[in-house]
A protein has these predicted regions:
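Short, charged/polar "capping" segments at the starts of alpha-helices
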Residues: 44-51, 163
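Short beta-strand-to-loop element that shapes/binds the nucleotide-sugar donor at the catalytic cleft/hinge
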Residues: 152-167
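Catalytic core and acceptor-binding pocket of nucleotide-sugar-dependent glycosyltransferases
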Residues: 131-137, 174-216
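Active-site-proximal specificity loops/subdomain of glycosyltransferases
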Residues: 55-120
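Hydrophobic targeting segments
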Residues: 1, 38-39
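GT-A fold catalytic core of metal-dependent nucleotide-sugar glycosyltransferases
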Residues: 98, 102-155
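Short, acidic, metal-binding catalytic loop of nucleotide-sugar glycosyltransferases
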Residues: 21-37, 52-57
Length: 216
């Protein structure tokens, strides 16, 4: 939510990429009021309003300041990579260097949750809060995940021709799938997240700064 908070209250910001924190909280109630166990990763000052919505439902909060992110040390590399192999800045206010660092942490967060398995469950799903916004165009999808699948399930986003080279692909903000949702059984999730983290670090070393969607 960093970029949304940064731009909140400022004029001339498109609603497709930016919404107020109040809008996020209001539109996410339907999701947050489900009885399923949640592990919520957020900035420290967002725990209170999120906890108020969750009530006594099983919930673990992971409050993390940016400088305490596991891969915070990768930010200088991302900054440098975007100078030499820049991505397409669809919305410059949102797609910043810090954004590319934060958005690629979701697989590490998911890996930690699946590894610890505090709620002793076989199934895991990552959901971006932004998915519940009407502007995302994804809010009304209902058949995201078939629980009987053994592989990781994700949402198809766009059908595009295969790029001619690696840089042509990684310079895009969007890939073939939406990065806001992925789900699966514990073993598949652990394999998927571990692989994405490894490949993301390798891609950074190659001089690119991919988004979560292009990594997926």
């Amino acid at each position: 939510l960093y970029n949304l908070r940064k731009r909140e209250g400022q004029d001339k910001v498109d609603s497709v990429h930016f919404s107020s924190i109040d809008t996020y909280l209001e539109t996410s109630k339907r999701l947050l009021e489900t009885p399923d166990p949640f592990v919520i990763f957020c900035e420290p000052d967002l725990e209170a309003p999120l906890r108020a919505i969750r009530g006594d439902r099983p919930t673990i909060f992971r409050d993390i300041k940016f400088e305490h992110l596991p891969f915070w040390d990768k930010l200088p590399r991302i900054v440098e990579n975007n100078k030499t192999s820049p991505v397409v800045w669809v919305s410059p206010e949102k797609f910043t260097d810090l954004y590319y660092l934060i958005i690629n942490h979701k697989v590490e967060f998911m890996r930690q949750v699946a590894d610890l398995n505090t709620f002793n469950t076989e199934w895991f799903a990552w959901v971006d809060m932004r998915i519940v916004l009407p502007e995302s165009g994804l809010a009304n999808l209902s058949q995201w995940w078939d629980p009987e699948r053994t592989n990781v399930a994700m949402m198809g986003l766009i059908d595009r021709n295969r790029p001619k080279d690696r840089y042509t692909f990684f310079r895009n903000n969007h890939g073939w799938v939406a990065g806001g949702f992925f789900a699966g059984k514990r073993a598949a999730i652990l394999d998927f997240t571990t692989t994405v983290i490894r490949e993301w670090k390798r891609t950074l070393d190659e001089g690119y700064s991919p988004s979560d969607e292009t990594m997926f």
